[in-house]
């Protein structure tokens, strides 16, 4: 686990990241897709890009056309460049207090246990050699940091802000049509039946799996492989994303629940994620 931090620092240089954020010149029309990691960011990027381009797939990496603000400097991208279509769109995993202000924002929340397990599956084979770190060890170590929970509570007070679209991952899985309609309305894209069907198709698991080379962080992976990671490492972002199918021990789940009680409950008033999303009108309303 100590080696993991050293490896990841080769891809996520804090100095370059801070410089990238400082250089970003936001516009009021910009859309920043800002969930915590493994909470539907890539999926939402694809929905957004499909809507604004009516189905463009002429890109090698979704984060080239909807760039990740924090890594733009290390990847040599001009974060302030014009994009293929309007509105401009960006990815970020920053908490609300750190994200550049003056834009529109899409935040997606997801069950912290599912998100934590998905993070392990994503890291295994890319940043972690398979078999060297267990899911329990990885998730428990990260649970102690409380990063998911602090990100969650930073966005929660802004869930009803006019310039924030606050979505629930589990509701997206259950009703993608409603999700697409809400995103289209939020980014002010006229949505007819043809565009709705194209967007449903292009954001489906089968389509994104068929084109997974566009969603595997190719730019970031190539930079990592040039440093310390083995060639051919697996960084696919396209996973089924099933709800409640994590394989974690009771101790790990308990640790995540404790963090929720410590950090999230005092801010939201909800004792669990399940209780919180039950309060959110479904699907993706309210």
Where are these regions (language model features)?
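PAPS/PAP-binding and catalytic site of the sulfotransferase fold
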Residues: 42-54, 166-191, 207, 232
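Helix N-cap / loop-to-helix initiation motif
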Residues: 191-192, 249
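PAPS-dependent sulfotransferase catalytic domain
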Residues: 1-167, 229-286
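Conserved ATP-dependent motor core of P-loop NTPases, especially the RecA-like helicase ATPase domain
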Residues: 198-199
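Short acidic/His-enriched helical or mixed secondary-structure segments at domain edges of catalytic enzymes
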Residues: 202-232
């Amino acid at each position: 686990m100590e080696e993991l931090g050293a490896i990841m620092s080769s891809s996520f240089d804090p100095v370059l990241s801070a410089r990238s954020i400082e250089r970003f010149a936001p516009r009021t029309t910009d859309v920043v897709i800002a969930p915590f990691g493994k909470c539907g960011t890539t999926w939402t990027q694809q929905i957004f890009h499909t809507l604004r381009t009516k189905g463009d797939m002429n890109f090698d990496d979704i984060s080239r056309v909807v760039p990740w603000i924090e890594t733009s400097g290390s990847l040599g991208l001009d974060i302030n460049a014009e994009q293929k279509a309007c509105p401009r769109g960006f990815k970020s995993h920053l908490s609300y207090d750190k994200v550049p202000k003056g834009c529109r924002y899409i935040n997606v929340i997801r069950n912290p246990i599912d998100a934590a397990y998905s993070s392990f599956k994503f890291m295994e084979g890319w940043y972690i050699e398979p078999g060297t770190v267990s899911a329990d060890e990885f998730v428990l170590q990260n649970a102690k940091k409380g990063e998911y929970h602090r990100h969650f509570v930073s966005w929660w007070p802004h869930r009803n802000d006019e310039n924030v679209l606050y979505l629930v991952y589990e509701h997206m899985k259950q009703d993608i049509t409603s999700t697409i309609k809400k995103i289209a309305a939020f980014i002010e894209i006229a949505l007819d039946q043809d565009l709705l069907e194209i967007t449903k198709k292009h954001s489906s698991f089968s389509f994104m799996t068929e084109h997974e080379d566009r969603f595997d962080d190719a730019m970031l992976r190539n930079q990592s492989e040039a440093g310390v990671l083995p060639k051919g490492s697996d960084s696919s972002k396209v996973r089924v994303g099933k709800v409640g199918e994590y394989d974690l021990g009771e101790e790990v789940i308990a640790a995540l629940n404790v963090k929720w009680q410590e950090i999230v409950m005092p801010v939201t008033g909800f004792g669990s994620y399940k209780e919180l999303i039950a309060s959110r009108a479904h699907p993706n309303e309210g």
